[in-house]
Swiss-Prot record:
One of its GO terms (cellular component) is cytosol. GO terms for biological process: regulation of DNA-templated transcription; rRNA base methylation. InterPro entries: MeTrfase_RsmB-F_NOP2_cat, MeTrfase_RsmB-F_NOP2_dom, NusB-like_sf, NusB_RsmB_TIM44, RCMT, rRNA_ssu_MeTfrase_B, rRNA_ssu_MeTfrase_B_ent, RsmB-like_ferredoxin. It comes from Shigella boydii serotype 18 (strain CDC 3083-94 / BS512). Belongs to the class I-like SAM-binding methyltransferase superfamily. RsmB/NOP family. This is Ribosomal RNA small subunit methyltransferase B. Its EC number is 2.1.1.176. Specifically methylates the cytosine at position 967 (m5C967) of 16S rRNA. The gene is rsmB.
Length: 429
């Protein structure tokens, strides 16, 4: 039996590592969840994700409730108070239980002398809640986004930025990809129905199903046998443009964690697929995905800027470049992105994308297809990137996705739809 741990202190320390040390929640959270009971895993995730989703609101409230911010070794207490405020604002946990557990968290982080302070701040919030929230709702902090990102969204989407921000602040729907080599989408939906769950097919992406209510993967019919994969609808859209065929040589560049690699093999089981990623650690997830789905691909560690180091002079019929990007289209899945990214990252990422595009283009056969994709909504990484590439690359031609003056297809995050995603389909003349 797992030792009873204080979830509030664990969540506070995880959020602190994201905000203060720049660590990714997807790296921090799984090892923490291994330390708690199954019934507590979901609550720990809810507290971490929720605090990061609403961080600017919680920060704003603490600044109003406390005369001085917590600094130095007491900084974790700042995040513990955030966890307390989040529970009072957004969960069904009874207030007395939320307060008691949060105050007890001070012992777990070895700050028992601050129990009174934590209790006092949270009770003060309860007394002033209505007045404080009225002021908060009139402030810029209400958008729950850093100011640099708000400015970029307002500039790029003067008519739509508010709906993008609103979608980013929602919990995401759970999209699945039915493995067409095992079942048709309709037959798998029937199995889902038999299991007491409801799903909805996507109108445009033939393998995509949205669950009415998110569910743990082990509850999904045939998950362990590779019948279905968790993948956002917009990510599945890459296959519409790539259109892989059997017997072709296909490169999936920046492939980890392998969702698109396995989708290529579901669409074209006899394709010769090479999956490459710079991050050796994340490549283990590509192997895991291939194993669960019973598929084979050549998996290599390599830098997209130097393809000759990992593929020599080899050329491919099709290349999927899911380029490293700001991930500003998937904030609802990864709310830590808002606080990990900086404005200065955007030109640096655009430069990296440009270098990879130029380096990999010679490895595409004449007449071949390259699909450039990002999970970003920022033009610098998307339409402007492809426009510049077309201008400097004489044998590149835009196909089916936009027009040369506004190249590519941009999906924006939507409440029941997929994430923010960009695609450009290029043909080598």
């Amino acid at each position: 039996m797992k030792k009873q741990r204080n979830l509030r202190s664990m969540a506070a320390q995880a959020v602190e590592q994201v905000v203060e040390q720049g660590q990714s929640l997807s790296n921090i959270l799984p090892p923490l969840q291994q330390k708690v009971s199954d019934k507590d895993k979901a609550l720990l995730q809810e507290l971490c994700f929720g605090v990061l989703r609403t961080l600017s609101q919680l920060d704003w409230l603490i600044n109003k409730l406390m005369a001085r911010p917590m600094t130095g070794k007491q900084r974790t207490v700042h995040y513990l108070i955030m966890v307390g405020l989040y529970q009072l604002l957004y969960t069904r946990i009874p207030p007395h239980a939320a307060l008691a557990e949060t105050v007890e968290g001070a012992i777990a982080i070895k700050r028992p002398q601050l129990k009174g302070l934590i209790n006092g701040v949270l009770r003060q919030f309860q007394r002033q809640q209505e007045e404080l929230l009225a002021k908060f709702n009139a402030s810029d902090a209400r958008y729950l986004h850093p100011s640099w990102l708000l400015k970029r969204l307002q500039k790029a989407y003067p008519e739509q930025w508010q709906s993008i921000v609103e979608a980013n602040n929602q919990r995401p729907p759970m999209w699945l990809r039915v493995n067409r080599t095992h079942h048709s989408r309709d037959s798998w939906l029937a199995l889902l129905d038999e299991a007491g769950m409801k799903g909805f097919p996507h109108a445009d992406y033939p393998d995509a199903v949205r669950l009415e209510t998110p569910a743990p993967v082990h509850a999904l019919p045939g998950f362990e046998d590779g019948w279905v994969t968790v993948q956002d609808a917009s990510a599945q859209g890459c296959m519409t443009w790539l259109a892989p065929q059997n017997s072709e040589h296909i490169l999936d560049l920046c492939a980890a964690p392998g969702g698109k690699t396995t989708h290529i093999l579901e669409v074209a089981p006899e394709a010769q697929v090479v999956a490459v990623d710079i991050d050796e650690q994340r490549l283990s997830r590509v192997y895991d995905n291939l194993k669960r789905l019973g598929m084979k691909a050549t998996v290599k560690q390599g830098d997209g800027r130097y393809p000759s180091q990992w593929c020599g002079e080899q050329q491919f019929d099709r290349i999927l470049l899911d380029a490293p990007c700001s991930a500003t289209g998937v904030i609802r899945h990864h709310p830590d992105i808002k606080w990990l990214r900086r404005d200065r990252d955007i030109p640096e990422l655009a430069q990296l994308q440009s270098e990879i595009l130029d380096a990999i283009w010679p490895h595409l056969k004449s007449g071949g297809t390259l699909v450039y994709a990002t999970c970003s909504v920022l033009p610098e990484e998307n339409s402007l990137q492809i426009k510049a590439f077309l201008q400097r690359t004489a044998d590149a031609e835009l196909c089916e996705t936009g027009a040369p003056e506004q190249p590519g297809k941009q999906n924006l995050p939507g409440a029941e739809e997929g994430d923010g995603f960009f695609y450009a389909k290029l043909i080598k003349k």
